[in-house]
């Protein structure tokens, strides 16, 4: 975007949020496809695919025609477009259009006076950066709102919402054409197979629409936290780096402060905290159960009035941290009370002091993961390992490498769990499944095959950290087991593990 800024400054249209003329600029498609500006992508030839500005202009004109499905049989170019080339040209324009509609958010970001105060760190992209935040804050909170962000009932509502950011009617009409081009476009945000090809061919446009949709819903959560919190936490501010549209927050605060100043007295709370991952958000508070009910219905009514979307009350759950587990990004997290007895002696008198402390306890959802392994044909529904028959035709090294990679990724992602027995069970299932797959391939017994491979076979299922720790720590010492039992969060995990995201 830094390189892109120099080009959009040459255009006068962006100053008034008129972006439609930019789609005819050649450098837009160069940036969208990651090509060098010195090498024109619109003049590049790849097989029978030719690019030119004339193609783009004719394509948009043809898309606006009401009789675009009535084509001449003698026009081979038109038949090619509405045949196998239709998807390609549509993808090309949608990529350029996606880059253009991102301009308002980028301009707000570079114009924000607070941009220098936001910490730039790649570690903030890690999912595991959320858990130290939860460990620090959840011990002092009581209740959590478990929120599933609602899907739009009609994408026309999303287009209307974009009007607040993009004032160019031509760009909005072009967006409607992209959406109406596909069947079941009203179900764009619902995970169905009918929209798989739309997402595959238009990833950038799909991600922009989804992020914008989530950002609009999440803005009210940021507003509540900013207005209600008297002592703003630095860790909370750092987590805002995880969203790419934080530049609009200052504008929203001014808008909401003017319109909702008389309502906020109902929601004063000294310590609300909000965290989101994909379409799920949590809003934790130290307030009473009655206050959480107020927040719940306030969010429902606000979304209904602002987005014309009726959100079912069951999509927002109120959980007590002391009695319920929070299902979030692949962990069952809760706050447990741990008792410890301290012996104190003063002269000849001895006292036993019973201390109760809170401890953040993230658990592995073992039942869900076993179901995911069973779905992937690594075991049955009861957790008994079976052979992976699909991989029998692969070489031995490829089979071991695939099983080992899955096992290491699971160990890496769930290293923060306080209870490692569930993780050991998952690793055991993968080890035996790998052994049975190899034994089935070579038509031998599992026990005899494991005996022939020896200990080198098991090393493929250990992470690099586990190999180092096994050399440093004593094997029979109690300290080694205590160290492995602790939580270890890594700052290089940018997405949830696929097995933990089984839906």
From Swiss-Prot:
Gene for this protein? matK
The terms describing its cellular component in GO are: chloroplast
Species this protein is from:
Silene latifolia (White campion)
Compartments annotated for it: namely: Plastid, Chloroplast
Q: Which family does it belong to?
A: Belongs to the intron maturase 2 family. MatK subfamily.
Q: What does this protein do?
A: Usually encoded in the trnK tRNA gene intron. Probably assists in splicing its own and other chloroplast group II introns.
Q: Indicate the secretion signal residues.
A: none
| Top-level lineage group | Eukaryota
What protein does this entry describe? Maturase K
Please name the GO terms of the biological process aspect recorded for this protein, alphabetically.
Answer: mRNA processing; RNA splicing; tRNA processing
